[in-house]
């Protein structure tokens, strides 16, 4: 039984995130999607809002679990008995950043392995920050985020 953890801010969740989750859940016995909650960061959506969206989006997979976490991801992995961290990489700059994190995580816990997953190429340009900016200008988000996320983005932007 191999448990894996896929952590991120998911602010908001995108089709790229879901593509990685869908593929990971076919490889690993369990995939734990962990919503990062860092009080020093400014998120558009609260941790609970992001968790709720991700739960809705992943409910079709019985082996995918969603939680929030506000500490080191290796500690979460150890807590649930996972030994794999999944990291999505779209390009060389993503890989460079994620490689450094993988080395650091390995230093924190020798049992942790990092698996890099490349999303389908049609999702390479998706960045949550760009999607939020596009939404703020009323841009078309179809093909970037699921309808429930698009609706939540529009509602959140109207509040601001």
UniProtKB/Swiss-Prot annotation:
What do we know about how this protein assembles, alone or with others? Homohexamer.
CDD domains, per database record = PPAT
Chain sites annotated for binding substrate: 9, 41, 73, 87
- Keywords associated with the record: ATP-binding, Coenzyme A biosynthesis, Cytoplasm, Magnesium, Nucleotide-binding, Nucleotidyltransferase, Transferase
User: GO biological process: any one?
Assistant: coenzyme A biosynthetic process
Write down what this protein is called.
Phosphopantetheine adenylyltransferase
Q: What's this protein's family per the entry?
A: Belongs to the bacterial CoaD family.
Cofactor(s), by name:
Mg(2+)
UniProt entry tagged with the keyword Cytoplasm: yes
Single annotated GO MF: ATP binding
EC number in record: 2.7.7.3
Residues annotated for ATP binding in this entry: 9-10, 17, 88-90, 98, 123-129
Pathway-wise, it operates in:
Cofactor biosynthesis; coenzyme A biosynthesis; CoA from (R)-pantothenate: step 4/5
One GO cellular component term noted in the UniProt record for this chain: cytoplasm
Per UniProt, subcellular location reads as: Cytoplasm
Catalytic class of the enzyme: transferase
Organism field: Treponema denticola (strain ATCC 35405 / DSM 14222 / CIP 103919 / JCM 8153 / KCTC 15104)
